[in-house]
Design a protein with these regions (language model features):
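C-terminal region of N-terminal signal peptides and the immediate post-cleavage residues
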Residues: 8-35, 433-440, 449
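Basic/polar, cationic surfaces and motifs that engage anionic cell-wall
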Residues: 143-185, 191, 195, 203, ...
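A detector of repeated loop/turn-to-beta-strand junctions in beta-rich toroidal repeat architectures
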Residues: 463-469, 480, 519, 533-538, ...
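Acidic/hydrophobic-patterned starts of short beta strands in beta-sheet-rich repeat architectures
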Residues: 449-457, 514-523, 577-586, 627-636, ...
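Beta-sandwich interaction modules
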Residues: 12-13, 44-56, 73-76, 81, ...
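Blade-edge motifs of beta-propeller repeat domains
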Residues: 432-440, 472-502, 541-565, 596-615, ...
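Short glycine/acidic-enriched loop and turn motifs that connect beta-strands
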Residues: 459-463, 526-531, 589-592, 638-642, ...
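Beta-propeller blade termini
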Residues: 438-448, 457, 504-512, 567-575, ...
Length: 878
């Protein structure tokens, strides 16, 4: 129950009821609250609020008494930062017509108002409403106020997602060693993998058929307070952050109403510019302010059924049952029998991310799978509101045929969901129809705080026994103070530390047990088994968020065990589309070997070549290369003849199969992402040595586009140091492309490529700094990679700490990953030869205006606690 108190003349404060979860232990808990300040009458109907001190808040919304009245002019607000004491510039606040209808739309508690605007932590406010000429606008509605929304602190993390817990109908399955291989090491941690009733694409009961893609026109059923029975879906439920987990108030003003089914999905955006600069680490707080906004407008609860962010997090919106046809308040006249999904951001200006689009498609597919709906079909809906009321474009009782996935603008006079998101609705529908749509969403977030996390492997540490350091991402990048070091002697890690194990030689993130937290796969290719097979190799999987339970396994099938070195490279993705990620591993021994382990332990394995010698430079990348919804794998290696190769493995309902070697030569590194923005993941191959790839003597990177058949050379692009607009020049031994990573650093919707050049020399003062190293960032475009706008970074770059020195090997490993949650991939760069062979990792953030050189941070062995001579910066994940 919310406590109501007067807090000075004209100010009303009420606290939103806290969820039952305890407050975050890392900081003093603060309950959410809303502080209401009445705007002052300035004569002739003009209203505003002069600068004044306030209680703490992070968002604002303007409201007024009459829900049908409209504010005159443009509402604007500016706020004072609680830390710096500086006042912001004026922010425009968009008026938002009410979207509730039916009984909820007739409530006396409804108020007119605006959308809420995120301000960040503030303690001062000023409000004005201005005309086009800059003067104060007259004729404002009565009862106008500004509500200061304080989201409080996040509830404590680590709660098991109710979405998955609710699906458990049997005891969790225990991972067991592969039964066909008696030499497989026993799993030491007795892990469990979440059992769900919807793992299989086969429905548990027959869904309602739709007959044809277009339903006949019929009046929309009246909503009912009766709670219908949940329906099973043909699609596995995606991981959803529940209301309890994001800290929703349960002080609902009423009870939910229900339709009879879900017929369509309506896609929205929050439409606020400040949401574009929000970190995904702040999305839970933003959810609480959106709920506060909707409460302030008089809604029963948050109006949307689901909300997603640019990192692909999915949030439960309106209460009443995620698997039920809950009537929302998101599209007046069309709230019944639709599911409303809002994307945090203003997509009139921002571009939607691949992760955000995939998250929407997963929700659509799951909800539609309950009713046998084709996401790419059409539906005829009947308007339940008079034309012109709150923007509704369709007269009461009139039918309109719409795509099953449509935008708010299709039925309402609004730009929502924005000029950049609206054209993506067809792709969302197509993705929702793919056979592998039940796939686990890609994640590198082990603590589920909304921000991807970094792994620095040091397999050469401690006499090559190996260690691994997990560094959580944060609002300012990797948080070294919160690091976790894992060895084979760490609590819960299977096995024991031994010289030569090379624990941490490879690592990969993914949600293996389907609980929403990223789990960590770790390679130890030098591990010996207990049956006398030296260097057989081992893969260890540790469950997030604690990373203190897990399991291990080794080679299986007919692969020669001795010298296999399984775990030399790893990739994690949902190869069979069952909602839980699977693990791919490869080893160098006896012509090379590979192993794909599905959830539950079923394993497929084989050899890469028929040679008896060892292959080299294994590197794996996963992505959906043919856009069928199943994760695929591209594996780079150098064969025994010294030639680089890339072999494609295709995902399907039965798992991963070896499709064959592609025509483009391999190199020493590989990465995946959608470079040309067409929805197919592409690969970028690092080809640093000419004799292996047939490329330039100093090295190159080659982007190979994904296609419905796997890969195509049509549209293939190559970047090297002699490419137009690339700084520097080709020199033998530069090792351009020795490491490579793919990510969207400028949030333009095209993945970019980051290439390490650890062999680059830097002459300084007449002295050549040999193998000092640097990196090149090449931009992605609709036609592939380009040298135009490319950026070179070294330790001699202005603002970057340190200096280029002989043997630093800057660029020995690279990661182009968003470690701050702002939707732009940051640069994380390894220099394993820095400070002798101690090594460093340098973090360089990507800002809205470019790279933040002055915010670059070096993480040394002191900061990360790695041993001396550990070669920190040799491997980075993701």
């Amino acid at each position: 129950v919310g406590a109501v108190a007067l807090s000075g003349a004209g100010i009303v404060t009420y606290a939103i009821a806290d969820p039952s979860a305890p407050a975050d232990a890392k900081q003093e808990g603060r309950a959410p609250a809303v502080h209401t300040l009445k705007l002052k009458d300035r004569g002739s109907g003009r209203k505003g609020l002069a600068k004044q001190d306030t209680d703490r808040f992070s968002a604002v919304v303007l409201t007024w008494t009459d829900p049908e009245a409209r504010a005159k002019g443009t509402p604007e607000v500016r706020t004072r930062d609680i830390e710096t004491g500086k006042w912001s510039g004026w922010q425009k606040i968009t008026a938002e017509p009410g979207q509730a209808d039916g009984e909820e739309g007739a409530r006396a508690a409804l108020r007119g108002g605006t959308e809420s605007v995120w301000t960040g932590d503030s303690d001062g406010v000023e409000v004005r409403l201005v005309s086009a000429d800059g003067t104060e606008a007259a004729g404002q509605p009565a009862g106008m106020d500004v509500k200061l929304l304080d989201p409080g602190t996040d509830p404590e993390g680590g709660i098991r997602p109710a979405a998955f817990a609710a699906e458990e109908t049997t005891a969790p399955a225990t991972d067991t060693p592969v039964p066909t291989d008696p030499a497989t090491p026993t799993e030491t941690a007795a892990p469990t993998e979440t059992a769900t009733t919807t793992d299989s694409p086969t429905p548990t009961e027959e869904p309602t058929a739709t007959g044809t893609p277009t339903d006949p026109a019929s009046p929309t059923a009246s909503p009912s307070p009766t709670v219908p029975a949940p329906r099973p879906s043909t699609v596995v439920r995606p991981p959803v952050i529940t209301q309890a987990e994001w800290g929703a108030s349960t002080d609902y003003d009423g009870t939910p109403e229900y339709g009879t089914e879900i017929k369509a999905a309506v896609v929205h955006h929050t439409g606020v510019n400040s949401d574009n600069s929000l970190s995904c680490g702040q999305s839970r707080a933003r959810m609480r302010t959106i709920q506060q906004e909707h409460f302030a407008r008089g809604y029963f609860d948050i109006g949307y059924n689901f909300v997603v962010d640019k990192c692909g997090q999915i949030f439960e919106g309106r209460s009443g049952g995620m698997d039920l046809p809950v009537r929302g308040a998101h599209d007046v006249g069309f709230n019944t029998d639709t599911v409303g999904i809002s994307y945090i951001g203003n997509f009139e200006s921002a571009r939607p991310s691949r992760a955000g689009l995939d998250a929407i498609a997963r929700i659509v597919a799951w909800k539609f799978g309950m009713y046998g709906i084709d996401p790419t079909g059409k539906v005829t809906l009947t308007s339940g509101m008079d034309q012109g009321v709150d923007g509704n474009k369709i007269p009461m009782g009139q039918s309109v045929t719409l795509p099953r996935v449509f935008g708010h603008r299709d039925t309402n006079s609004t730009a929502c969901p924005g000029a950049n998101l609206y054209p993506k609705l067809t792709r969302i529908a197509q993705t929702a129809k793919t056979p592998g749509i039940s796939h686990a969403l890609a994640t590198s977030d082990f603590n589920r705080d909304g921000i991807d996390d970094l792994v620095a492997g040091t397999p050469r540490a401690l006499s090559n026994g190996g260690t691994l350091t997990v560094v959580p991402g944060g609002l300012d990048g990797p948080v070294a103070a919160a690091r976790r070091t894992l060895t084979q002697n760490s609590t819960g890690v299977p096995g024991s530390h031994e010289s030569g194990d090379n624990f941490g030689a490879a690592a990969a993130w993914g949600d293996v047990n389907g609980d929403g937290y990223a789990d960590l796969a770790i390679g130890a290719p030098g591990e010996d088994d207990t049956s006398g097979h030296a260097d057989r190799g081992q893969v260890v999987v540790m469950y997030g968020p604690a990373l203190n339970t897990g399991f291990s396994y080794t080679t299986s099938g007919s692969v020669t065990a001795t010298g296999a070195r399984l775990g030399s490279t790893l990739a994690v993705g949902d190869f069979n589309g069952d909602g839980k990620a699977d693990v791919f591993a490869a080893g160098t021994g006896r012509g090379g070997n590979w192993n794909a382990r599905l959830t539950g332990g079923a394993t497929t394995s084989g050899t890469l070549t028929t040679a008896t010698g060892a292959v080299a430079y294994l590197d794996a990348a996963t992505g959906d290369f043919n856009r069928d919804g199943y994760a695929d794998v591209a594996l780079n290696y150098r064969d025994t003849g010294g030639i680089g190769r890339v072999v494609r493995f295709a995902g399907s309902a039965t798992g991963l199969t070896k499709a064959g070697v592609i025509s483009v030569k391999g190199g020493r590194a590989i990465a995946a992402g959608d470079v040309n923005g067409n929805g197919y993941d592409d690969i970028v191959i690092g080809q640093p040595v000419a004799s292996e790839s047939g490329g330039l003597s100093g090295g190159q990177i080659t982007m190979v586009p994904g296609a419905s058949t796997g890969f195509t050379t049509t549209g293939m692009t190559t970047i090297h140091q002699d490419t137009a607009n690339v700084a520097g020049g080709n020199e033998s031994g530069d090792l351009f492309g020795a490491s490579v990573s793919v990510g969207d650093y400028n949030a333009d919707g095209f993945a970019d490529a980051l290439a390490g050049v650890p062999g680059e020399d830097f002459p300084r003062g007449g002295v050549n700094q040999s193998n000092a190293g640097d990196v090149l960032l090449a931009k992605g475009t609709a036609t592939g990679l380009t040298g135009t706008g490319s950026i070179r970074v070294s330790q001699d770059t202005t603002g970057v700490p340190g200096s280029a020195e002989t043997g630093d090997l800057f660029g020995s490993a690279v990661s182009l990953t968003d470690l701050s949650g702002y939707g732009r991939a940051d640069l994380t760069l390894g220099a394993e030869g820095e400070d002798g062979t101690d090594g460093i990792v340098l973090y360089l953030p990507s800002n809205s205006t470019g790279l933040g050189y002055t915010q670059a941070v070096i993480h040394s062995k002191t900061a990360l606690g790695t041993p001396t001579d550990a070669h920190l910066g040799q491997t980075l994940t993701p």
